[in-house]
């Protein structure tokens, strides 16, 4: 399968008081180069995932690096067979990854970074408690062997989970955390360090860097890694897995899930069918019809 689109997942924490001034030039460049995706700007830095041609992504990354605060962004590259985003957004936010706890600053205090090559040894240590900081639907399709699933719906719930399980968390000497690309662990490890935990570690570059770097035969990862774009999930070597999203609840679906009697394209799946009313489903059906009509109109306009 030909992979025409380069995908860049990037973030950089910085003290960026003038972040509002960067919104327009970033959006203008992305639109001029036909780059799509989302970039978040806040006083604490930049975060996002974008996709485009190889040259366009290189130009954007070089432009970002011209900002003195963004000299060394954390970037993971991968490829997609089709454009994994529908539009380009550059948003101004309070946080570039939302934890909702005031005063957490990874520039001041953070866990110890562990390279993918050293990760297996750390998480196989009997004194290490391994925590998946992602959401429950991400954990459901893949994680590291032996990892604890906090069962959270959003990252905002993570601090409360830590506080509830503080007694259990202190039973092991070391705490190791991981997430998709590394940014959530910047905040989660900073948070637990502020609580007084000392031996706190996190996977540098996140799961994506591990799957890119570590051969499958040496890997302690099971399943797939959920990604927040139209690829839905990737596996070792950052290859696409062929999943789709339920457009009603955004749960990842494989071929088997689409055979369920509860599955209806754009309307429902096993994960959300019993959580929605028939009124909800009719609303989703109408939305799905409008989306399909919009696609048809776009296709006809290109043919004229």
Curated annotation (Swiss-Prot):
Keywords tagged on the record: Oxidoreductase, tRNA processing
Enzyme Commission code: 1.14.-.-
PROSITE patterns: RHODANESE_3 (PS50206)
GO terms assigned for molecular function: oxidoreductase activity, acting on paired donors, with incorporation or reduction of molecular oxygen
Domain Rhodanese: 124-219
Catalytic activity line of the entry: uridine(34) in tRNA + AH2 + O2 = 5-hydroxyuridine(34) in tRNA + A + H2O
Function comment: Catalyzes oxygen-dependent 5-hydroxyuridine (ho5U) modification at position 34 in tRNAs.
NCBIfam families linked: PRK00142.1-4
Protein name: tRNA uridine(34) hydroxylase
Gene: trhO
């Amino acid at each position: 399968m030909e992979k025409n689109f380069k995908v860049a997942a990037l973030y950089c924490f910085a003290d960026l008081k003038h972040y509002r001034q960067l919104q327009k030039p970033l959006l203008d460049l992305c639109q001029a180069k036909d780059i799509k995706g989302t970039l978040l700007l806040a006083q604490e830095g930049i975060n996002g995932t974008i996709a485009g041609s190889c040259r366009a992504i290189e130009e954007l990354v070089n432009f970002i690096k011209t900002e003195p605060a963004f000299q060394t962004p954390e970037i993971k590259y991968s490829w997609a067979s089709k454009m994994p985003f529908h539009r380009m957004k550059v948003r101004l936010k309070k946080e570039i990854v939302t934890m909702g706890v005031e005063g957490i600053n990874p520039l001041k205090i953070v866990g110890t970074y562990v390279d993918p090559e050293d990760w297996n040894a750390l998480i196989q240590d009997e004194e290490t408690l391994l925590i998946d900081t992602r959401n429950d639907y991400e954990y459901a399709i893949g994680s590291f062997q032996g990892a604890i699933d906090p069962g959270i719906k959003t990252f905002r719930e993570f601090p409360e989970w830590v506080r509830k399980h503080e007694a259990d968390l202190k039973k092991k000497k070391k705490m190791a955390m991981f997430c998709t690309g590394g940014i959530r662990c910047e905040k989660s490890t900073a948070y637990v360090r502020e609580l007084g935990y000392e031996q706190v570690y996190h996977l540098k570059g996140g799961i994506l860097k591990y799957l890119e770097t570590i051969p499958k035969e040496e890997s302690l990862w099971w399943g797939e890694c959920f990604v927040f774009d139209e690829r839905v999930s990737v596996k070792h070597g950052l290859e696409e897995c062929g999943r789709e999203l339920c457009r009603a609840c955004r749960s990842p679906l494989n071929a088997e899930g689409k055979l369920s009697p509860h599955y209806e394209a754009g309307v429902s799946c096993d994960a959300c069918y019993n959580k929605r009313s028939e009124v909800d489903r009719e609303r989703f059906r109408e939305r799905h019809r409008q989306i399909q009509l919009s696609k048809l109109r776009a296709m006809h306009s290109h043919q004229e």
